[in-house]
């Protein structure tokens, strides 16, 4: 089998017992399968939930806390217990682990985004298994990923993974809830994830986790946009992950095996960078950006909104107000206001910035579903 870079996400329900406590037998089963993958030469990055589930028992809670403070306190206690379990288990296979705790803010800064990539790839080059979790004990609501499903999708994207494997307590995606409808149909393969499927999906699937099927669909949709194929399902035994890579997994395969990765710079522009303003463009510029792969020139700009600086990321909308993409601008809002609608030669007379483009095509990402820009 071809050596692959694989992101494996393990949910809380796949790590805990019926009471919600950390189950070391389940944890070891996952560890054994990851160790087997590494022995075969694959690169593995582990995204793990379970900190809150591991910590609420020692804190004296009878079940998973519902308040933010309770969850964060449980995560503070549970993260150490969770890592202790992983370190002890992986040590039996001679595997060194490295812990990385992230918040949404780590993805906003382009410098931190690149530093994160460098750290993880260095760990992989040294044979270390990166174990990643959201830093639940310090995250505030507006800086969270929502669940580790989305975190796993974002990590698989910027690491240019070959596959994202999301392990859960349900063996794949269904057209209805299989726990309440025994006639629910399981999908063995889905070419893509539609908005209608996401709207029809329910909420959290268990009392010990935050990620139900809806979050997994959203994560799969995001991973596919990065060029990463996805598997959602379950399994047991040391060969379960390799079986999944070979197409023999008990779950749902989503997307083609490989259809090209989105560049890391464009991932940051499209999904992570703060949006500093908005530019409206005419029909000709819209066609040039979406269909001809051209850069945005001053002549195509019809309106400027916000107070952004040069090299900020802005949204680009058409004359109907629909967002068609995002890009990194070479002009500040005030400079662009002076040169909008002008030819490139005329624009040079009014600005000290002699760049002909407002947004170069290398710093542009289309967000229109019918147009894919790599």
Swiss-Prot record:
What does the UniProt keyword field contain?
Answer: Amino-acid biosynthesis, ATP-binding, Cytoplasm, Kinase, Nucleotide-binding, Proline biosynthesis, Transferase
**Reaction(s) catalysed by this chain's protein:** L-glutamate + ATP = L-glutamyl 5-phosphate + ADP
InterPro entries, per the entry: AceGlu_kinase-like_sf, Asp/Glu/Uridylate_kinase, G5K_ProB, Glu/AcGlu_kinase, Glu_5kinase, Glu_5kinase/COase_Synthase, Glutamate_5-kinase_CS, PUA
Query: What PROSITE patterns does this protein's entry cite?
Result: GLUTAMATE_5_KINASE, PUA
Query: Acyltransferase: present as a keyword of the record?
Result: no
Q: Name one GO molecular function term.
A: ATP binding
- SUPFAM superfamilies under this entry? Carbamate kinase-like, PUA domain-like
Q: Specify the enzyme's EC class, one word.
A: transferase
Q: Which Gene3D superfamilies does its entry note? A: Acetylglutamate kinase-like, PUA domain
Signal peptide (from-to): none
Record flagged with keyword Hydrolase = no
Cellular component (GO) terms are:
cytosol
Residues forming the PUA domain are 276-351
**Pfam families xref list:** AA_kinase (PF00696), PUA (PF01472)
Q: Which SMART domains match?
A: PUA
Q: Where does ATP bind?
A: 9, 168-169, 210-216
EC number assigned by the record: 2.7.2.11
Q: In which pathway does this enzyme or protein participate? A: Amino-acid biosynthesis; L-proline biosynthesis; L-glutamate 5-semialdehyde from L-glutamate: step 1/2
Which family is this sequence assigned to?
Belongs to the glutamate 5-kinase family.
> What's this protein's function?
Catalyzes the transfer of a phosphate group to glutamate to form L-glutamate 5-phosphate.
What's the protein name?
Glutamate 5-kinase
| Organism per entry | Geobacillus sp. (strain WCH70)
Question: Its gene?
Answer: proB
């Amino acid at each position: 089998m071809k050596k692959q870079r694989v992101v494996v996400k393990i949910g809380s329900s796949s790590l805990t017992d019926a009471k919600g406590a950390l189950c070391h037998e389940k944890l070891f089963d996952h560890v054994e399968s990851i160790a087997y993958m590494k022995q075969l030469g694959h690169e593995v990055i582990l995204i793990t939930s379970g900190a809150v589930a591991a910590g609420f028992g020692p804190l004296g809670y009878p079940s998973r806390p519902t308040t933010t403070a309770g969850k964060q306190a449980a995560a503070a206690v549970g993260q150490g217990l969770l890592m202790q379990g992983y370190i002890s288990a992986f040590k039996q296979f001679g595997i060194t682990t490295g812990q990385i705790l992230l918040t949404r803010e780590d993805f906003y800064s382009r410098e931190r985004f690149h530093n994160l990539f460098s750290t993880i790839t260095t760990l992989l080059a040294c044979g270390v298994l990166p174990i990643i979790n959201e830093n639940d004990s310090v995250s505030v609501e507006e800086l969270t990923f929502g669940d580790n499903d989305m975190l796993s999708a974002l990590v698989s994207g910027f690491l240019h993974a070959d596959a994202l494997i999301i392990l859960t307590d349900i063996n794949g995606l269904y057209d209805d809830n299989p726990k309440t409808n025994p006639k629910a149909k399981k999908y063995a393969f889905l070419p893509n994830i539609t908005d209608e499927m996401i709207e029809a999906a329910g909420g959290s699937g268990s009392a010990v986790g935050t990620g139900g099927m809806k979050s997994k669909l959203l994560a799969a949709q995001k991973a596919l946009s990065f060029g990463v194929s996805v598997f959602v399902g379950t399994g047991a035994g040391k060969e379960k992950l390799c079986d999944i890579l070979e197409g023999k997994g008990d779950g749902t395969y989503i997307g083609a095996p490989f259809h090209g990765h989105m560049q890391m710079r464009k991932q940051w522009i499209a999904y992570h960078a703060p949006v500093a303003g908005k530019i409206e463009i005419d029909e000709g510029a819209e066609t040039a950006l979406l269909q001809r792969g051209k850069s945005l020139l001053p002549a195509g700009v019809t309106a400027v909104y916000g107070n952004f600086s040069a090299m900020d990321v802005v949204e680009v909308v058409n004359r109907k107000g629909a967002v068609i993409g995002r890009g990194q601008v070479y002009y500040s809002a005030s400079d662009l206001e002076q040169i909008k609608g002008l030819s490139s030669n005329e624009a040079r007379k009014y600005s000290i910035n002699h760049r002909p483009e407002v947004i170069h095509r290398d710093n542009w990402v289309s967000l229109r579903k019918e147009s894919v820009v790599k």
